Amino acid sequence: MPKGDGKLVAQNKKARHDYAIEETFEAGIVLQGTEIKSVRNARVNLKDSYARIDKGEIFLHNMHISPYEQGNRYNHDPLRTRKLLLHKKQISRLIGETKESGYSIVPLKMYIKDGYAKVLIGVARGKKKYDKRQDLKQKEAKRDIERAFKERQQ
């Protein structure tokens, strides 16, 4: 999570709805040329993205970074596979956790921290339909309670 002066660039709200997040990790991301300029302009979409482990390295797939407007021919493929930067211990831990069936790695947030682009990834287990319904009911009940409490104070 961004501590202090981390500027939030993109957030994957759908991930918290579709998955139960077990654990989170902060990872750096390898970007090329004009991609960082698009990231700083918050032209990023994490909606359908996911991370995969390949030969001891973690790669982020299907993350859309829009081409930079003034980048002309130097722009890169918007859906290019990007490498995530983590410590070896963290990678081995992620490998162990994702070997269990039902677990996957999803990006939750992207932000700029101390001038570097960071991605908050989470080890997640998919929610069933009834879990999603239950979460929505709890959220709605909490909202109703807060609304009633606010009306009493006025």
From Swiss-Prot:
Its main location: cytoplasm. This is SsrA-binding protein. GO terms for molecular function: RNA binding. Keywords: Cytoplasm, RNA-binding. It comes from Listeria monocytogenes serovar 1/2a (strain ATCC BAA-679 / EGD-e). Belongs to the SmpB family. GO terms for cellular component: cytosol. CDD domains: SmpB. InterPro entries: SmpB, SsrA-bd_prot, SsrA-bd_prot_CS.
